[in-house]
Curated annotation (Swiss-Prot):
It comes from the Bacteria. One of the components of the core complex of photosystem II (PSII). PSII is a light-driven water:plastoquinone oxidoreductase that uses light energy to abstract electrons from H(2)O, generating O(2) and a proton gradient subsequently used for ATP formation. It consists of a core antenna complex that captures photons, and an electron transfer chain that converts photonic excitation into a charge separation. This subunit is found at the monomer-monomer interface and is required for correct PSII assembly and/or dimerization. It comes from Synechococcus sp. (strain CC9902). Belongs to the PsbL family. This is Photosystem II reaction center protein L. One of its GO terms (biological process) is photosynthesis. The gene is psbL. One of its GO terms (cellular component) is plasma membrane-derived thylakoid membrane.
Length: 39
């Protein structure tokens, strides 16, 4: 994921959105893993 062709064109919201998506992905993965292990 090194698409640093135009770093000045990237807004600050993109970093925040990717951070939120990463947290959501970790949360969903944790819920799926816990439900899989507790089954």
């Amino acid at each position: 994921m090194e698409r640093n062709t135009n770093p000045n064109n990237l807004p600050v919201e993109l970093n925040r959105t990717s951070l939120y998506l990463g947290l959501l992905f970790v949360f969903v993965t944790g819920v799926l893993m816990s439900s899989y292990f507790f089954n």
